């Protein structure tokens, strides 16, 4: 399973060719594409009215994960561990990282500096 963060979703929705290729390859390879409900929140918070239909179509293609107690607890631990040394990481990113850990998914993001808890993380494009 691949867990996408908001950067991948935004790139895809904005027509970034590399994001479209990445998601198409994952689908063609039978890979499950998941995202945290927090990604849905961030996308809905920033969408223009003219983009709502495309956003809803995107939503239907993704498996959505809820924020569970385990995710909240692990996210809290990650925030305590990294907040003082990695300023600028918001709480949503800690919870997305915790989601990847709990559901045992590979995190896909272009914003690797917000995920120091995954030292080998590289942007997918």
Curated annotation (Swiss-Prot):
Pfam families, per the entry: PIN
Required cofactor names: Mg(2+)
First-listed, main subcellular location of the protein, grouped into a coarse class: secreted
GO CC annotation terms, alphabetical: extracellular region
Keywords, alphabetical: Hydrolase, Magnesium, Metal-binding, Nuclease, Secreted, Toxin-antitoxin system
Family listed: Belongs to the PINc/VapC protein family.
Name used for this protein in its record: Ribonuclease VapC19
């Amino acid at each position: 399973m691949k867990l996408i963060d908001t950067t991948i979703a935004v790139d895809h929705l904005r027509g970034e060719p590399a994001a479209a290729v990445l998601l198409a390859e994952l689908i063609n390879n039978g890979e499950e594409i998941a995202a945290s409900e927090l990604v849905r929140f961030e996308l809905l918070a920033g969408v223009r009215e003219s983009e709502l239909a495309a956003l809803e179509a995107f939503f239907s293609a993704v498996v959505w994960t809820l924020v569970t107690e385990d995710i909240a607890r692990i996210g809290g631990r990650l925030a305590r561990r990294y907040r003082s040394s990695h300023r600028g990481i918001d709480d949503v990113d800690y919870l997305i990282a915790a989601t990847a850990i709990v559901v045992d998914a590979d995190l896909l993001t272009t914003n690797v500096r917000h995920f120091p808890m995954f030292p080998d993380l590289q942007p997918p494009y």
